[in-house]
Amino acid sequence: NIIVDDQYVILEGQHRYEAIKDLGLPLTYTIINPEDSESFIISMNTNTKNWKNDEYLNFYAKKEKTKNPLNYHDMPYHNFKRARYYKIHFMTLIELIYSSRQKEHTIGFGKGKLFIQDKALFKENVNFLVTAMKQHKACEHRNTQLALCKYLIDKNFDKETFLEKLKKFPDKLVPSSTMDQATLNIKTL
């Protein structure tokens, strides 16, 4: 069954539609109210298997693009998606946005309530993490990224000095199995 809106735009089942069309089989579809489409699609998909954070991300990024075709690139889920493209971990980005990893933030993310209060600072911190990751493989590690978030919150943390020290003493920073160890590694650097 294909899900369409009142304008017959396919909301769910694009691949099924293509396969049915190619096979010449009869097509069945359900028309739903556009206002209900978001909750209906999420509910339908979570009943078959639980959605992962990146599936919510793609869903809401697509919704932002549809609702704001001229400026969707500056919308919260698109900024988040751009950072995910660079392999920054999901919880690291939640920490950068909210200075916290509380469950309520991830629940809100899945409900379409992502809000980035300071987009410029978020982008600056993402760019810093991308630079650090390019400079040292340990910065790709989740615990290192989360530990760096704690430092990024500190106004006295000098990003340039950190990157210079990382270049000079790369052996001091190693992947860590705990965030405490990652924090200590960064501190000793």
Predicted regions and their residues:
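Accessory terminal alpha-helical modules
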Residues: 1-189
